[in-house]
């Protein structure tokens, strides 16, 4: 993924040194775009090994509408443990907003299901968006959403998606985000009998934490390898019935992992 390496190099070259909520400090740029053609391979980072199980289980967790980490922990995924309360809840984050957005009238809106309906009945719609940024719920969230809004687009029976990410931890978070939304595009395309197109990513505050800069410099010395391919082994009756075993990553040959500390 040469685009990812190019982004790291730009942050190191022209980034602004900023303070942040965690106290770690960041090297930051504002506004950045990348585009991945999913027909040319699955954009899973090869310059360091990514934990595929965490990416897939987290996405399935979001799609369940779940906001308790028990499902993740049962599957040996700990990426949300630092933000959960004593009962394992992380507040009304992604899953809640995607599947059960609360209205002032007391109703709940399933944004994902609504998008699926539009994709099948009116694929030219410009209203196929999902938002995680529910202003009325922000103070109840243990960690407000970083990837906040995504929109689908269909042309020539091909599905594309654009994501806006307000805050992006480039070293630890971004590789997960790119892979996760690319998997989601594959899943929805399969459910709607569409081909996969492009994943477009837009970042707002795009940053390297100060304690990741030297790790990132090590990573950019590695030459990106051929992207793997994602295969979905079966087609469930519903988007919400996929399980971890349905996904197979073929030809993933990354460099060794580079571990970095997470800023909380």
From Swiss-Prot:
It comes from the Bacteria. It holds the Pfam family Thymidylat_synt. InterPro entries: Thymidate_synth/dCMP_Mease, Thymidate_synth/dCMP_Mease_dom, Thymidate_synth/dCMP_Mease_sf, Thymidylate_synthase, Thymidylate_synthase_AS. Its main location: cytoplasm. Keywords: Cytoplasm, Methyltransferase, Nucleotide biosynthesis, Transferase. CDD domains: TS_Pyrimidine_HMase. It catalyses: dUMP + (6R)-5,10-methylene-5,6,7,8-tetrahydrofolate = 7,8-dihydrofolate + dTMP. GO terms for biological process: dTMP biosynthetic process; dTTP biosynthetic process; methylation. It is found in: Cytoplasm. It is an enzyme of class 2 (transferase). Its EC number is 2.1.1.45. GO terms for molecular function: thymidylate synthase activity. Coiled coil: none annotated. Pathway: Pyrimidine metabolism; dTTP biosynthesis. One of its GO terms (cellular component) is cytosol. The active site is at residue 146. DUMP binds at residues 21, 126-127, 166-169, 177, 207-209. SUPFAM superfamilies: Thymidylate synthase/dCMP hydroxymethylase. Catalyzes the reductive methylation of 2'-deoxyuridine-5'-monophosphate (dUMP) to 2'-deoxythymidine-5'-monophosphate (dTMP) while utilizing 5,10-methylenetetrahydrofolate (mTHF) as the methyl donor and reductant in the reaction, yielding dihydrofolate (DHF) as a by-product. This enzymatic reaction provides an intracellular de novo source of dTMP, an essential precursor for DNA biosynthesis. Belongs to the thymidylate synthase family. Bacterial-type ThyA subfamily. This is Thymidylate synthase. The gene is thyA.
């Amino acid at each position: 993924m040469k685009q990812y390496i190019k982004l790291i190099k730009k942050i190191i070259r022209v980034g602004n040194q900023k303070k942040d909520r965690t106290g770690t400090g960041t090297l930051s740029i504002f506004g950045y775009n990348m585009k991945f053609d999913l027909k040319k391979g699955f954009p899973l980072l090869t310059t360091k090994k990514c934990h595929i199980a965490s990416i897939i289980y987290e996405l399935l967790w979001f799609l369940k509408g779940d906001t308790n980490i028990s499902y993740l922990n049962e599957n040996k995924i700990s990426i949300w443990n630092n933000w959960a309360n004593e009962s394992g809840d992380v507040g009304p984050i992604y899953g809640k907003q995607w599947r059960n957005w609360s209205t002032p009238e007391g109703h709940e809106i399933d944004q994902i299901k609504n998008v699926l309906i539009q994709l099948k009945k009116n694929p030219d719609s410009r209203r196929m968006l999902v938002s995680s940024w529910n202003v009325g719920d922000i103070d109840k969230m243990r960690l407000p959403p970083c990837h906040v809004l995504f929109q689908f687009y269909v042309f020539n029976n091909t599905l594309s998606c654009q994501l806006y990410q307000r805050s992006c931890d480039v070293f630890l978070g971004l590789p997960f985000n790119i892979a996760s939304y690319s998997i989601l595009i594959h899943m929805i395309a399969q459910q709607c009998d569409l081909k996969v197109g492009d994943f477009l990513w837009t970042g707002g505050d795009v940053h390297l934490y100060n304690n990741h800069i030297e790790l990132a410099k090590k990573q950019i010395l590695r030459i990106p390898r051929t992207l793997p391919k994602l295969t979905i082994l079966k087609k469930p009756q519903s988007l919400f019935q996929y399980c971890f075993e349905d996904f197979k990553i073929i030809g993933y040959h990354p460099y060794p992992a580079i571990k970095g500390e997470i800023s909380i």
